[in-house]
UniProtKB/Swiss-Prot annotation:
The chain crosses the membrane at residues 95-115, 129-149, 158-178, 211-231, 233-253, 273-293, 305-325, 363-383. Residues 1-65 form a transit peptide. The gene is GPT1. PANTHER family: SOLUTE CARRIER FAMILY 35 (PTHR11132). Disruption phenotype: Gametophytic lethal phenotype in homozygous plants. Pfam families: TPT. It is a multi-pass membrane protein. Belongs to the TPT transporter family. GPT (TC 2.A.7.9) subfamily. It comes from Arabidopsis thaliana. Glucose 6-phosphate (Glc6P) transporter. Also transports inorganic phosphate, 3-phosphoglycerate, triose phosphates and, to a leser extent, phosphoenolpyruvate. Responsible for the transport of Glc6P into plastids of heterotrophic tissues where it can be used as a carbon source for starch biosynthesis, as substrate for fatty acid biosynthesis or as substrate for NADPH generation via the oxidative pentose phosphate pathway (OPPP). Required for pollen maturation and embryo sac development. Preferentially exchanges Glc6P for ribulose-5-phosphate (Ru5P) in reconstituted yeast proteoliposomes. This is Glucose-6-phosphate/phosphate translocator 1, chloroplastic. NCBIfam families: tpt (TIGR00817).
Length: 388
């Protein structure tokens, strides 16, 4: 684009020095002057291709300068046009992020509702977790096959680096599902809001990282709020509580492995999560068979169909599909926004899940329990602010 346009006493343009009287014969390929004489005292310094045109009006020649991007055929906006274009671009970006967030929250709420319905009728969290990963893997394989999504270019090193991430993701996913099979959805998410505390502790004592005092102070309301909610939970279950805690720890390691191993990898957020789901599915399937087994699944399936009816099949399909979709959108959102904005969005997502699950499942909540949840979520928000 144009770097400078200024007036001097020398009739030269860019690197071309010309005599006005001899300029009528021919012109450089990149310049066009319809008028009979090039206006004097003009210097243009450029770093990209220019198109210049001169037109004579009533008394004096007017030089019109348009800058073109090298790979575009339209003039690059200048001045007020550039400001208007930038404002329009910012508005479009904010709208796109808003749509991402709204979709992310909505999909997550729907998943948690159907997931809890399935687990209430069919208490086999290992199979439920496996079906969630299988549905997402199948959806992405079809998307790659028909060309809806570009197939990622991966190699052995990519999958080797992804393996520890997939192990941590598998453990976190199964542990969270086990937790939801034993306790209320709201309680699981209240405990999972304590994930930042695990992140700081692991980073401090295992990785040797240090944090500002404000980060450590933000852990006080997180830990205190989670503890208050756990102590006042009406339907407390130790397996459910420990499942949520293990999920927190596993997802912390997943994030650490992902940050360390995936630097410089040119894979989009959507494809990255697809590869993660496929590898996690391969890891989880043999363990699910060993822990629960086909015989238990068949017996439980028949019981669920007899109790709930044919709509139970829809519940299973919905929870599996929506699990992949909400995670996929979250990874796509992370491609577009800063980690701070993502953390705030994740906090708001957890609030929407807790509130909606309490309303839909009519979960009894004591005032002290609600206070603990609010304190824990506030601490999570303060942590996201202090961390960055």
């Amino acid at each position: 684009m144009v770097l400078s346009v200024k007036q001097t006493l020398s009739p030269k343009i860019g690197l071309f020095r010309r005599n006005p009287s001899s300029s009528l014969g021919r012109s450089p390929v990149s310049l066009s002057f319809p008028s009979t004489e090039l206006p004097k005292r003009t210097v243009l310094a450029v770093s990209k291709p220019l198109h210049l045109s001169s037109s004579l009006r009533a008394k004096s020649p007017v030089v019109r300068c348009e800058a073109y991007e090298a790979d575009r055929s339209e003039p690059h906006p200048i001045g007020d046009d550039a400001a208007a274009a930038e404002t329009k671009s910012e508005a479009a970006k904010k709208l796109k992020i808003g749509i991402y967030f709204a979709t992310w929250w909505a999909l997550n709420v729907v998943f948690n509702i159907y997931n809890k319905k399935v687990l209430n009728a069919y208490p086999y969290p290992w199979l439920t977790s496996t079906l969630s990963l299988a549905a997402g893997s199948l959806m992405m394989l079809i998307s790659w096959a028909v060309g809806i999504v570009e197939t990622p270019k991966t190699d052995f090193d990519f999958w080797k680096t992804l393996f520890p991430v997939a192990v941590a993701h598998t453990i976190g996913h199964v542990a969270a599902t086990v937790s939801m099979s034993k306790v209320a959805v709201s309680f699981t998410h209240i405990i999972k809001s304590g994930e930042p505390a695990f992140s700081v502790l692991v980073s401090r004592f295992i990785l040797g990282e240090t944090f500002p005092t404000s980060v450590y102070l933000s852990l006080i309301p997180i830990i205190g709020g989670c503890a208050l909610s756990a102590l006042t939970e009406l339907n407390f279950n130790m397996i459910g509580f420990m499942g949520a805690m293990i999920s927190n720890l596993a997802f912390v390691f997943r994030n650490i492995f992902s940050k360390k191993g995936m630097k410089g990898k040119s894979v989009s957020g959507m494809n990255y999560y697809a590869c993660l789901s496929m590898l996690s599915l391969l890891i989880l399937t043999p363990f699910a068979i060993a822990v629960e087994g086909p015989q238990m699944w068949v017996d439980g399936w028949q019981t669920a169909l007899a109790t709930v009816g044919p709509q139970f099949v829809w519940w299973v399909v919905a929870q599996s599909v929506f699990y992949h979709l909400y995670n996929q959108v979250s990874y796509m959102s992370l491609d577009q926004i800063s980690p701070l904005t993502f953390s705030v969005g994740n906090t708001m997502k957890r609030i929407s899940v807790i509130v909606s699950s309490i309303i839909i499942f009519r979960t009894p909540v004591q005032p002290v329990n609600a206070l603990g949840a609010a304190i824990a979520i506030l601490g999570t928000f303060l942590y996201s602010q202090a961390k960055l």
